Amino acid sequence: MAADGDWQDFYEFQEPAGSVQEQENCNASPEAGAGAHAGGDSFPALASSLEEKLSLCFRPTSEAEPPRAAVRPITECSLLQGDEIWNALTDNYGNVMPVDWKSSHTRTLHLLTLNLSEKGMNDGLLFDASDEEELREQLDMHSIIVSCVNEEPLFTADQVIEEIEEMMQESPDPEDDETPTQSDRLSMLSQEIQTLKRSSMSSYEERVKRLSVSELNELLEEIEAAIKQYSEELVQQLALRDELEFEKEVENSFISALIEVQNKQKEHKETAKKKKKLKSGSSQNGRSERSHMPGTYLTTVIPYEKKSGPPSVEDLQILTKILHAMKEDSEKVPSLLTDYILKVLCPT
């Protein structure tokens, strides 16, 4: 019986079919061993019986045994679900009412500390009806935008200048009595100049009347010489002005011709690229009567020798003629280019 109590925990590992028979064998084996070897050494018998019991208890289970449930690990959630203290805390947490700040004791102490009163606040917030209406009109953005849109168009600069002059004339100057303005000073200066002219003319007439005939002849010769000198200088200045104007015209014509030729060369390059892409036999049917291909003279390179100063007017005229011929793709380009090389680059 003692053996049954000791090995009761190992019976669950035995097969369900022969569990009773095996238990009887386990219970009967020690008695048989004890009877057989009662007279001899009992230690080997006990050892052999213990080995038999262990082999019966720890032998592998058969495939016919029903599967047992899988072992589930114990997690924190499973522990908290069965905890009474945790359930009591979480169940009562949602039932707590929020704190009303206005009716709290802290709010009353706060108001007392700030020394606020509803009467003073209301008095400060009250506005006069007229002030409120004026403020509303000032803050009316719609009326402001509409008024800006409906305004008259902008004045020109001349109109603004005229209005400023009218305002200057209409506005009284408080310092008129004390200090004269710039216009008054100018008028005074003009009056003084007129008086000086009159006095000089009168004095000059008196001085001429006092001169003798010989002195008058000398004065006349001096005046004629001065007139001749001034006339020659005037003619020279007019001729110089004409030369400068002509030089400017030549330079402008040269620049315009150069720009036109450059644009023509760009167009020619684009058309040449387009013609290369086209694969048709229209070139044989559409022959031109010209003796050269179109654009032959347009890409002519004009030799130029850089000098210390700018090119002269004659050089610019020759270059302008060559550029015009290049623009028109004329056959005169070789002859003009030859004349330019012989006369300008390599003069004899």
From Swiss-Prot:
GO terms for biological process: negative regulation of autophagosome assembly. It comes from the Eukaryota. Residues 206-280 form a coiled coil. It holds the Pfam family FEZ. Residues 11-40, 265-296 are annotated as: Disordered. The modification Phosphoserine is found at S130, S171, S190. Involved in axonal outgrowth and fasciculation. Homodimer; disulfide-linked. May form heterodimers with FEZ1. Interacts with synaptotagmin. This is Fasciculation and elongation protein zeta-2. It comes from Mus musculus.
